[in-house]
UniProtKB/Swiss-Prot annotation:
Residues 42-266 are annotated as: Disordered. Belongs to the splicing factor SR family. Residues 102-114, 133-144 have a biased composition (Basic and acidic residues). Residues 202-212, 235-244 have a biased composition (Polar residues). One of its GO terms (cellular component) is nucleus. Splicing factor that seems to antagonize SR proteins in pre-mRNA splicing regulation. Coiled coil: none annotated. This is Serine/arginine-rich splicing factor 12.
Amino acid sequence: MRSFSGAVWERQVSLGAPSWPAAMGDRIYSLEARAVARSVLARPRRPRAPRPRLRLRGRPGRGRGGLLGAGPREACLATPGPPTPPCSSGTSQTPPAPGQMKSKERHLCSPSDHRRSRSPSQRRSRSRSSSWGRDRRHSDSLKESRHRRSSYSQSKSRSKSLPRQSTSLRQSRTPRRNSGSRGRSRSKSLPKRSKSMEKSQSRSPQKQTGSGAKSRPHGRHCDSIARSPCKSPRAYTSSGSKTQTTKHSHLRSHSRSRSYHHKNSW
């Protein structure tokens, strides 16, 4: 606008016209007046700009100023700080003031009030949901443990009832699950049983009779008899087989009772 008005002023001066405001046409004067009016109208509006209000609205809990404040906020506003510098228009003083007072009151007042007023229902629902999940988990684990206990007790009772039946069924050559290292059939388990018999006799000295010292070579010879009977001498075979059969019948009863007690111990 200044460059245009300057050009017009130069023209008017060169043409010998009177002073500038009188020489300016109505159109140019109206444009200048409009520009000045716009600038004058824009100056008081600057403090009233929507930016601070938008900032206050953008923050949660600072919605429409301290004019509609509740009880604790009004109590805080009753003790004002230093007055804020007034803007060009008197009415525009209110929007920045509540924000400042709010920031001050948040520090001055007890923070528990605001914490309480923020979201107690949310907090309650959160705690409820978490405790509900915990209870649910706890009940599930309880059910699982009960189920485990019941299944364990059932299996225990089954294992207790099994050996009684198996004592009668063990004479048949069906392999048993809990027979362990005593072999699947009698013909295979003869050498193993003789070894276990030797161990038991060496452990318990009160069971050893007068022939206890001779029991070890007899056992070894019996192993060789079971593996290759033609190599061993005849005298040993007749006496050894007799002693072995008697000892084995005795040992079978012992091993059965031992396995029965061992299974029932746990």
